[in-house]
Amino acid sequence: MNVVLKPAGQELVLTRDLNAAPARVFAAWTDPRQSSVWWVPKDCTLLSCELDVREGGAWRRRMRVPDGSVVTKHGVYREVSPPDRLVFTYNSEYADGRIDPETLVTITLAELAGGRTRLTLRHSGFWDEASRVSHTGGWTGAMERISDFFPA
């Protein structure tokens, strides 16, 4: 996996080559039953997952984090272009009432030889270095889990 970190306020880019065709990977992002398996950091427990996958539709995921508190991640789909592109806003709400500023996630799926897919995740709009680093850890775990979801 490649990780590219740019100056604060810009973007985080992660790539992963997966053992599945783009349509299957797109479904893993858009089907709640599939995304519930992998779209959560390894040290967290997913409590709920709601996906209204259409432009203007909302998504919402609640998870229990290692300290026992509940964090809600949510946003709105800006672009849904199966099987190769998904764009959505990304917000975090914490048990103590904090709400992070909205950011933007773009998922691009490129077909590779042998029925494989290159997944590129771009997360932009971070407000500071600490936020970007924190999201890098979370997304890296999710990328490991989606890779495991499509074993060789």
Question: Which residues make up each language-model segment?
Answer:
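Hydrophobic ligand-binding cavity/cleft-lining segments
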Residues: 1-45
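Charge-dense, helix-prone N-terminal extensions
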Residues: 4-9, 49-54, 62-65, 72, ...
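Short beta-edge strand/loop motif at the mouth of beta-sheet-based domains
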Residues: 13-14, 33-70
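Hydrophobic/aromatic beta-strand elements that line small-molecule binding cavities or substrate pockets
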Residues: 16, 48-51, 73-79, 103-111
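Hydrophobic pocket/interface hotspot
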Residues: 25, 35, 59, 77, ...
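Short amphipathic alpha-helical signal-transduction/dimerization elements
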Residues: 30, 143-151
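Short, conserved beta-turn/loop elements at beta-strand boundaries and strand-helix junctions
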Residues: 81-86, 114
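Beta-strand/loop substructures that line and gate deep hydrophobic ligand-binding cavities in soluble
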Residues: 89-140
